[in-house]
Each structure stands twice: as C-alpha cells, then as structure tokens.
Amino acid sequence: MLLTPEFVSPALSTKEIYDRQRSLAETRDPTVFKLSAQLLEQGRTDTPLCATEGMTARLKVYASGGENALHAHPHEDHMFIVLQGSAQFFDADGTMAQLGANEGIMLPKGSYYRFHATSDEPLVLLRVGTPNQSPKLSPNRIDPKGEPIVGDSKENKSVSVRFRDGEYFG
C-alpha cells in the first residue's frame, strides 16, 4: 500500500499534543506527513507529525512577536530547526542564539531556554525530541524554580490563536 502524506491540523492544547503523540507512537507503522501549517496572526500552534516510544517530531508555528517563558524539559533532549522566519533564543543569562531559516539549536535535557519570534513573518519550526514525553516522565516542563508549568498556560505566555485566512507554510 502506498502511503500518502496529508495535511494534519494543529493540536490546540497541551493535552491534545500529548494525546496525539501517544496515539502516533502506538501505531508501530511507518508514518508519512507534510510539513504544512496554517500561519498565524496571534498565538502559537503545535502539530504532532510522527512519534515512537523514543522520539517525537512536531511542526510549531508562532505569530510574529510570539514567545514562551523560560523553562526546561528535565527528561527530554530536543532540537529546533527554523523553517521560516527567525527567532532569538535565550538561556537564564541572556541571549544564546539568533537563528534564521535552515538554522537550528540542540537543547540537552534540563537546559533552560525561551525564544521570541523576531521576524515580521510568522515563525515556523521543526521540533524533534527524545524520548517521547509520557506521564511517567512528569513533570515534562519546569520553570526556573523547578515547578511544573503547562505549555498552553498564561505563565508560559500562551495567548488565543488567530489564524491567517488562507495563508499556509508548505
């Protein structure tokens, strides 16, 4: 059977992201996907593309000026590759890297970071992490005080999503 990549709609909550990743990891079959996402006027989205027990890949979109709060993933090594736009990455001491299209950053587990979408156009990132986050590896995101922080929370600078009508990456 020929596998055909299809557009995947974004997950709009942290719970939905992890539910989809768990479901994808359970399939045990090859997965094909498109690097395609609707662009944003405001907010951010995550689209789980593929997952196994040991790895995940997501397409992330941030509106221009979008950001998140300083945090770490204590059980997950992960990397970002900028596909469109640009982002400034920060650690606890300040600026760590300014990245544009086709540039990336690797963050070992426990590394504190945050980033800010610096281009006028929306930021599109490919995020790959290992291992797949699961409830037994809780908490999966912590703030600088070591306290759990939810990805789609006000504390993590989450705002409501507004899509750009008819505008897509990929």
Task: Kindly give the residue locations of the regions a language model identified.
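Short histidine-centered beta-strand/loop micro-motifs
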Residues: T47-A51, K60, A69-P74, D91, ...
